[in-house]
């Protein structure tokens, strides 16, 4: 499974159980990255993808319980740590600015960054994509 998350410069993930920001081009990018599999997300995140032609989206509140090894999971407002054991890849999208946050996440030991790229968002001048793979023991 591949997990997608968004973080700010201070590794902030959410504030008061809400996403820190949103970006239309980021959602289009996530849809394109996941087009060869199922893209799972909660029903709140699904609204971000309205108007994007992505027939592979499965939105349900307990989506992580149904995730399969080849699925892509867009996780907002929740700590991904409990799900990392089932994941083979982790993609972090960085907003490249700081937002208020009360939920933080740092990529733990055992994950190796294999790629870093940047692209222009619709509401963010630069979004950084960091791709990680789980290290083999």
Describe the residue ranges of each PLM region.
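Enzymes that bind and transform nitrogen-containing heteroaromatic metabolites
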Residues: 1-137
């Amino acid at each position: 499974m591949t997990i997608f998350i968004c973080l700010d410069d201070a590794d902030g993930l959410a504030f008061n159980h809400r996403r820190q920001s949103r970006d239309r081009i980021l959602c289009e990018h996530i849809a394109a990255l996941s087009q060869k599999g199922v893209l799972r997300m909660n029903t709140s995140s699904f609204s971000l993808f309205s108007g994007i032609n992505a027939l592979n989206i499965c939105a349900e509140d307990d989506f992580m319980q149904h995730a399969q090894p080849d699925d892509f999971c867009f996780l907002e407002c929740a700590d991904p740590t409990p799900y990392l054991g089932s994941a083979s890849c982790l993609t972090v999208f960085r907003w490249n600015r700081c937002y208020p946050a009360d939920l933080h996440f740092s990529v733990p030991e055992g994950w190796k960054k294999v790629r870093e790229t940047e692209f222009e968002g619709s509401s963010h001048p630069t979004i950084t994509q960091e791709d990680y793979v789980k290290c083999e023991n």
